[in-house]
Structure formats: structure tokens, C-alpha cells
Amino acid sequence: MSSPSFPRVLIFDSGVGGLSVYREIEARLPQLNYIYLFDNAAYPYGELTQETLIARVDTLVTRMVEQERIDLVVIACNTASTIVLPVLRAKLTIPVVGVVPAIKPASLIASKAIGLIATPATVKRQYTQELIRDFSANKNVELLGSTRLVNMAEEKLRGKPLDLEELASILQPLKNTIDVAVLGCTHFPLIKEEIQQVLGEQVQLIDSGLAIARRVQELLGIEQAVGAKQKHRIYASAPPWEESALNIKLEQLGFNPVQPFLHPI
């Protein structure tokens, strides 16, 4: 049962990666009412055209905002954030927070080189190149784009063990070349321990989760709190694969079982 006295926050992603952002916000502001919506009908977003992505995010988010009387939206997807934020901010009257790869803080602490681990779409996007140019021009940035890492995070959340040899093979280009790695996809903090194990303790891993949590707190004007855990709602645009296994993990994170949010787009 949601508490009507606290703001409602919508967290949106194409998959379950945004749950890493939810964990950071919820740890800081447990008293809020959280609604999570993932557009798994169009997962992964990196393979969509820009026009299709904008249409899907715009439609699903605005409908959920109306249905649940949302007070703040978090677009917990790097691919969507770089494209759709201006559209949503022009349309909605509530705050919309996006995700940006943590290139700027990484450049402040890297002494060797930075590794940006993201989706192929994020790595190729002009927005990412501009971030590197503006905030890390004096540091070498190694780019690694992988869709398989995204799927590995999805599998882990359904109880499947990660193949560390496969992970090591994917991350091999960054081995012994960097001292800071930016987790540039919200899925990747879900497999942070395994990435750390492969790259070694000498590599510092950073992501945008905590910065997003602080921004949400600032926009809502709410004090950090320790509160009783409550059950939140999670919606999917299509039936999730291995839904029963996923619901087990979702319950541990404070969610009721996945509900359908089926809207033609």
C-alpha cells in the first residue's frame, strides 16, 4: 500500500538496469513511493531508431505520469536520456532527471586512463564524445561498448550465475590500461562486484547512481531519512522472460510482482 503523504517517483528504463538507480535513491529516501516501469517490449533501446525511441518513451512515461500522479521522473537509461529528455521536459510540468556517464568525476581521480564501459549506442553517440571532449580532454579514455554485459546483468537478476571467463574476455581490452572505469549503463552496477573482480582492486569503478539520488533529493526538497520498507509497484510493457525468477529478486528489492502496462504505440 502506497503512502499518499510522500511524493511518487517514476523510474523508467528499457530493462531492469534502472533498479541500480532505484537502489541508490531508495537507500537515501526510503519514505518515497516508487513506481518502476520498464519497456521490455522494445529492449534493448540501443537498437531503436531515434524517432522510435522518442515515441515509445514519450508515450509510456506520460501515460504513467497521468495514471499514477507522479511527482518526479527518473529516466534511468543512458541511451534514452541522451535523446528524449528535452521532449519530456517540454511536455511535463514535473521534474525529469536523466542519466549521464560519470566522465567528469572520473577525470578528476584518474591518474592513468579512464575506461568507459557502456552500450555500443552510448559509446557511438555524439553526446558521449562531447562529454569526453569537455571534461576529459587531458585524459586518455578507452571506450568499450557491449550489449552482452547488459544481458548478463538481466540474467543475474533472474538468478543465473555470471560466467567470469566470458566477462574477462569482454573486458580484456581494458585490463592493465586504466585505473578508473565508468559504468556507463545503469545495468552495469548490478554486476559491479564481478566487474571489479575481473579488472582488479586497483581499478576504481564509478557510476551515476549516487549523483542521481542526490539530485532527486534536491528537487523534492526532502531530508534524507531512515524509514520502514514498503512495497512498491513495477510495470512492464510486455511479459518479462523468466518472470517468476525475476519476481523473487524484485521482492527482495521491495517490489510487488510485475504488472502489465500494455499500451499500443
Curated annotation (Swiss-Prot):
The keyword Cell wall biogenesis/degradation applies. InterPro entries: Asp/Glu/hydantoin_racemase (IPR015942), Asp/Glu_race (IPR001920), Asp/Glu_racemase_AS_1 (IPR018187), Glu_race (IPR004391). It catalyses: L-glutamate = D-glutamate. GO terms for molecular function: glutamate racemase activity. Keywords: Cell shape, Cell wall biogenesis/degradation, Isomerase, Peptidoglycan synthesis. The keyword Cell wall biogenesis/degradation applies. GO terms for biological process: cell wall organization; peptidoglycan biosynthetic process; regulation of cell shape. It comes from the Bacteria. Its EC number is 5.1.1.3. The active site is at residues 77, 185. Substrate binds at residues 13-14, 45-46, 78-79, 186-187. Pathway: Cell wall biogenesis; peptidoglycan biosynthesis. It is an enzyme of class 5 (isomerase). NCBIfam families: glut_race. Provides the (R)-glutamate required for cell wall biosynthesis. Belongs to the aspartate/glutamate racemases family. This is Glutamate racemase. It comes from Vibrio cholerae serotype O1 (strain ATCC 39315 / El Tor Inaba N16961). The gene is murI.
